[in-house]
Swiss-Prot record:
GO biological process: cell adhesion involved in single-species biofilm formation
Lineage: Bacteria, Pseudomonadati, Pseudomonadota, Gammaproteobacteria, Enterobacterales
Keyword list, A-Z: Disulfide bond, Fimbrium, Signal
UniProt source species: Escherichia coli
Protein name per Swiss-Prot or TrEMBL: KS71A fimbrillin
Localisation per UniProt entry: Fimbrium
Protein encoded by which gene: KS71A
Family under the similarity heading: Belongs to the fimbrial protein family.
Pfam families per UniProt: Fimbrial (PF00419)
Function of the protein: Fimbriae (also called pili), polar filaments radiating from the surface of the bacterium to a length of 0.5-1.5 micrometers and numbering 100-300 per cell, enable bacteria to colonize the epithelium of specific host organs.
PANTHER family referenced in this protein's UniProt entry, alphabetically: FIMBRIAL SUBUNIT (PTHR33420:SF26), FIMBRIAL SUBUNIT ELFA-RELATED (PTHR33420)
Length: 187
């Protein structure tokens, strides 16, 4: 009888081990990659803000031809984890707030550095305006108005819209695209 009990215990251990071994077999797998960039700046740029895509959808050719402008789309640049302690300085006895301004670069439309030329032979252009409605220039040198910063997260607001370019040609059907780059300057 003792042999039967020992044999039963051994059999149970083997079955139990087999069940546990089967449960630990991977039933799916994946990979997580991590990346980033350390910058010498008071703020980081949120990933979604660093590379954005704005889709204007389908736009009526006749609407643009008659001087229409699409509904503005938000173009927000979110700055994260800002530490503006070193930006604040005494200037004339008063504390100066930390600020940021931007420059935009791209291919300006013909005779208009405040319009971004599109690619695609549609004779359209993109206009970007700051929060006060002032058009930004795509010359890579003209700074936008300075925005005050706080410690933590900050969002710089712009809008973008499409209109007929200044080429004098009729708006044509087809797909278009454009790329603008921005640079930050902290003060």
């Amino acid at each position: 009888m003792i042999k039967s009990v020992i044999a039963g215990a051994v059999a149970m251990a083997v079955v139990s081990f087999g069940a546990n071994a089967a449960a630990s077999i991977p039933q799916g797998q994946g990979e997580v990659s991590f990346k980033g960039t350390v910058v010498d700046a008071p703020c980081g740029i949120e990933t979604q803000s660093a590379k954005q895509e704005i889709d204007f959808g389908q736009i009526s050719k006749s609407f643009l031809q008659e001087g229409g402008e699409t509904q503005p789309k938000d173009l927000n640049i979110k700055l994260v984890n800002c530490d503006i302690t070193n930006l604040k300085q005494l200037q004339g006895g008063a504390a100066k707030k930390g600020t940021v301004s931007l420059t935009f670069s791209g291919v300006p439309a013909e005779n208009a550095d405040d319009m971004l030329q599109t690619v695609g032979d549609t004779n359209t252009a993109i206009v970007v305006t700051d929060s006060s409605g002032k058009r930004v220039k795509f010359d890579g040198a003209t700074e936008t108005g300075a925005s005050n910063l706080i410690n933590g997260d900050n969002t710089i607001h712009f809008t973008a819209f499409v209109k007929k370019d200044n080429s004098g040609k009729n708006v044509a059907e087809g797909a278009f695209s454009a790329v603008a780059n921005f640079n930050l300057t902290y003060q």
